[in-house]
């Protein structure tokens, strides 16, 4: 299991000359979903830590990338392969990914807390994927970012059919609307047809709103700050997204 995830993560990072531990951890979670699917519910933080360590400390497979060398720039610790000297653009790319990753990882526990509160009264289990159960109805929630959800959309569409219940991707708010507009333009119809739901948590306000899709248990609607958000997005953004062409 660990080996498969490490190998998938190594493929994702192939060609990279500099990374951070934060980026590796964030992408390890994505790869774990791809390999494990709904089984991710039963996995704790130790698996992701083991996968992360494989790439920067002690490889657990010959197919694992190994970013064995460290260099600290400012407050950020970068890793790169032995005998490879990263260039300026390599560090710039790694720093961009670091900022994206740190923002997500810092918001992760808050996102889970907000989602738990939304599903108050449901039994909850899992860390990187949460399963909420009540009266025979299941909701599976995976935590990601809207940009990563865009890249992994095929995996998320597959998950809708794999789980025995509803599948929701929980993402944090962004500083700009463009990532959401991009996803809506490209994949909103596919998501709606499949039944994929995407809800947005504001980590600062600790609120949650629907972006695409609603829960089948309409008693849950009261948990959204703005229950009409997904309907408003669907109505107004069909015109707005043409601006991206």
Swiss-Prot record:
It comes from the Archaea. Signal peptide: none annotated. Gene3D superfamilies: af2093 domain, af_2093 domain like. This is Uncharacterized protein AF_2093. It comes from Archaeoglobus fulgidus (strain ATCC 49558 / DSM 4304 / JCM 9628 / NBRC 100126 / VC-16).
């Amino acid at each position: 299991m660990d080996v498969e995830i490490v190998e998938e993560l190594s493929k994702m990072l192939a060609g990279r000359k500099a990374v951070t531990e934060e980026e590796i951890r964030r992408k390890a979670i994505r790869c774990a979903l791809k390999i494990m699917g709904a089984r991710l519910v039963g996995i704790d933080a130790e698996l992701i830590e083991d996968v992360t360590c494989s790439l920067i400390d002690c490889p657990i497979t010959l197919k694992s990338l190994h970013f064995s060398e460290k260099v600290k720039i400012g407050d950020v610790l970068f890793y790169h392969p032995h005998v490879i000297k990263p260039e300026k653009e390599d560090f710039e790319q790694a720093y961009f990914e670091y900022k994206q990753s740190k923002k997500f990882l810092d918001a992760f526990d808050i996102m889970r807390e907000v989602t738990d509160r939304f599903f108050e009264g449901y039994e909850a289990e899992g860390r990187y994927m949460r399963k909420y159960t009540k009266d025979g109805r299941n909701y599976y929630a995976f935590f990601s970012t809207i940009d990563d959800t865009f890249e992994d959309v095929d995996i998320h569409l597959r998950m809708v059919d794999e789980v025995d219940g509803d599948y929701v991707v929980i993402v944090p708010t962004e500083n700009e609307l463009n990532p959401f507009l991009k996803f809506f333009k490209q994949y909103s119809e596919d998501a709606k047809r499949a039944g994929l739901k995407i809800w947005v948590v504001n980590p600062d306000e600790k609120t949650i709103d629907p972006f695409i899709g609603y829960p089948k248990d309409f008693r849950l609607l009261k948990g959204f700050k703005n229950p009409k958000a997904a309907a408003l997005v669907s109505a107004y953004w069909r015109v707005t997204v043409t601006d991206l062409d």
